[in-house]
């Protein structure tokens, strides 16, 4: 995990533009504690080991966020609080995770969640490290602004027998839209963590049908997991990177983006972005 996360964080350090790293908090997102096969004790030692690898010492406000896929959204919210309330110049949000360990793969196989020649309703496991540098708006062209974040809890999880109504995702998306001061109809497209399982696409469709109140000819959904595999806690910085690259290279569907994320345990999160 150290060697997945460190190169991505190093790129953020290279963009600090004179800011002392000792004044930069690092919010490091990792797998949720109840994930089968998860490495023991990563909350206790991974942050320090990454600092040793990079040869730097981040601000003491740095911490590990052990909340899986939705952890990155919590970290983005936390970074905003640190920047605006703690008056930090910037903050790094990083995520690192792997599904390529025996215990994790065995649990996924038992629940028939891996994509195989005999199971089309599954995903390809992967591993990744990703990081983004967040700061206050500068007004420069090419910026991607976080307008809002919201969170929810879903009772009908992927392993439950309850009927899915996307209550948790609706709650998360509405929270993000309220904070952004926008409606669903104002947004141009979506980038999500759906990984190929039918559950995720169904949840996204249900949430959209329950919130969207205007007719839209199209409302694209991008899913980077198709390219990188299921990468758990690394997905939020990856999605932010995809959105930023698309904005700067002018291939986004439009400037306003809804990003949403889901954990197996029911945690839900959404972020609204806007390119400037």
Question: Which sequence ranges carry the predicted segments?
Answer:
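A short beta-alpha structural unit
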Residues: 188-198, 224-231
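Short coil/turn connectors at secondary-structure junctions
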Residues: 21-25, 59-60, 86-91, 120, ...
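Conserved catalytic cysteine-centered active-site region
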Residues: 1-3, 35-78, 87, 101-103, ...
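Alpha-helical metal-binding/catalytic segments enriched in His/Glu/Asp
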Residues: 76, 129-137, 240, 244
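Short beta-strand segments
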Residues: 27-30, 66, 91-97, 259-262
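Short acidic/glycine-rich loop or secondary-structure boundary segments that cap or lie
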Residues: 101-102, 154-157, 198-201
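Condensing-enzyme catalytic core mediating Claisen C-C bond formation in acyl metabolism
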Residues: 109-182, 188-189, 265, 271-276
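Conserved active-site "lid/cap" helical segment
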Residues: 1-38, 78, 82, 164-190, ...
């Amino acid at each position: 995990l150290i060697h997945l996360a460190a190169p991505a964080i190093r790129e953020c350090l290279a963009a600090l533009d004179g800011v002392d790293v000792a004044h930069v908090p690092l919010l490091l997102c990792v797998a949720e504690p109840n994930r089968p096969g998860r490495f023991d004790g990563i909350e206790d030692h991974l942050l320090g080991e990454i600092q040793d690898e990079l040869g730097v010492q981040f601000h003491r406000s740095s911490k590990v966020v052990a909340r899986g896929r939705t952890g990155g959204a919590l970290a983005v919210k936390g970074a905003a609080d640190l920047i605006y309330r703690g008056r930090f110049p910037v903050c790094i949000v990083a995520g690192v995770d792997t599904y390529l360990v025996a215990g994790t793969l065995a649990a996924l196989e038992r629940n028939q969640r891996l994509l195989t020649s005999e199971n089309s309703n599954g995903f390809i496991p992967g591993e990744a490290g990703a990081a983004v540098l967040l700061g206050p708006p500068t007004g420069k062209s090419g910026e991607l602004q976080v307008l809002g974040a919201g969170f929810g809890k879903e009772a009908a999880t992927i392993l439950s027998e309850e009927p899915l109504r996307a209550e948790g995702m609706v709650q998360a998306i509405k929270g993000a839209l309220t904070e952004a001061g926008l409606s669903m109809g104002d947004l141009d497209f979506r980038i999500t963590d759906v990984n190929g399982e039918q559950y995720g696409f169904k949840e996204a469709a249900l949430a959209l049908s329950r919130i969207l109140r205007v007719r839209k000819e199209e409302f694209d959904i991008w899913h980077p997991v198709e390219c990188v595999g299921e990468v758990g806690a690394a997905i939020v910085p990856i999605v932010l990177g995809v959105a930023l690259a698309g904005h700067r290279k002018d291939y986004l569907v439009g400037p306003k983006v809804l990003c949403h994320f889901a954990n197996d345990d029911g945690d839900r999160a959404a972020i609204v972005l806007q390119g400037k």
